[in-house]
Amino acid sequence: MDDDDFGGFEAAETFDGGNGETQTTSPAIPWAAFPTVSGVHLSPPSPEIVLDHDHSSAIDCLSSDAIISSPENTHAENSIVSQTIPKAQIQQSTHTHLDISLFPLGLTDEKSNGTIALVDDSEDPGANVSNIQLRQKISSLEIKLKVSEEEKQRIKQDVESLMEKHNVLEKGFLKEKEQEAISFQDRYKELQEKHKQELEDMRKAGHEALSIIVDEYKHQRLLEMLDTEKELLKGKIKEALIQQSQEQKEILEKCLEEERQRNKEALVSAAKLEKEAMKDAVLKVVEEERKNSEKAHAEERELWKTEHAKDQEKVSQEIQKAIQEQRKISQETVKAAIIEEQKRSEKAVEEAVKRTRDELIEYIKEQKRLDQVIRQRSLSSLELFLSCAQKQLSALIATEPVDIE
């Protein structure tokens, strides 16, 4: 539906007449354009109006038939158009129709600025009569213009009221649709949460069942492996202890033999040193005594013998005492060495047992860690499988139409 259906309010256009003459531009509507003729032109404001008698019939025809329609026809046409035009087109064309004035308003403006002067090259005697008729028609046109202006204002008010009603209805419709969309969205969210919770429950149930089965299997397998490793470690510990005791026994025998040899050599060397020392001392004493005895050889010979016997006795006693002390020291040294060697061997055995126990614990921890890694991998693969299944279920749920009514 174009703009002519709403009363023909549109911008002025220029049309060419059928005889090739340029038509005057109507300020409001295209059908108000009329051809200009020779001797007729617009002039500045003038108190006189001269009309060409030859063209008076054409002007009368235009003024009576084509210049403007009656207020009743305009009102009927506008009422029919207002009933048939959709709301969207009324919105789009409201500003255009309200801003465009009618042709009679243009004539009124022209009249307010100055009167229309129609000048003919040759003056007729009936020009005064035509001027009077033209004045009467102009006055009637002014009355019709006022009526059309009032009709225009009334139409403008009707359009504004219709626009306000349309805006109110549109706001109510949009609010209702927004509330429906919010309710639909809430219901969709509830359904989505429900499906999500059901999928989560299914995933948790499957995960728990699988984790229980895997834990049972791992526990059984770990017990079997621990039993096997325990038997193997018992055999290894027994063999290691036997071998360690044999080695400790051999080392102890070697140490005792070496210690015995060292003690024997030490005793021999000590006896030799003591003997040499005593011999030197005895020789010195003998030399002194010999010198003294040379002076009193006869008297002191007996004394010297007795003293010499005493000295020999003392020397033998000292030698025996030194030998006994050396023997006690050697025995104590051997006992201390044996006790220390026993303690060392016991400590070595304890360290070997502790080291073996630590190695066993480390091995068990390593096995537990490997089992944990395998379990984590299994759980990760299961989690990946369940997430893929959840995505597929979400995709299937999204592709199916949701019954929201």
Curated annotation (Swiss-Prot):
It is a peripheral membrane protein. It comes from the Eukaryota. Keywords: Coiled coil, Golgi apparatus, Membrane, Phosphoprotein, Protein transport, Transport. Residues 1-16 are annotated as: GGA1-binding motif. It is found in: Membrane; Golgi apparatus, trans-Golgi network membrane; Golgi apparatus, trans-Golgi network. Residues 210-377 are annotated as: Homodimerization. InterPro entries: CCDC91. Residues 1-27 are annotated as: Disordered. One of its GO terms (biological process) is protein transport. The keyword Phosphoprotein applies. The modification Phosphoserine is found at S43, S46. GO terms for cellular component: cytosol; membrane; trans-Golgi network. Involved in the regulation of membrane traffic through the trans-Golgi network (TGN). Functions in close cooperation with the GGAs in the sorting of hydrolases to lysosomes. Homodimer. Interacts with GGA1, GGA2 and AP1G1. PANTHER family: COILED-COIL DOMAIN-CONTAINING PROTEIN 91. This is Coiled-coil domain-containing protein 91. It comes from Pongo abelii (Sumatran orangutan).
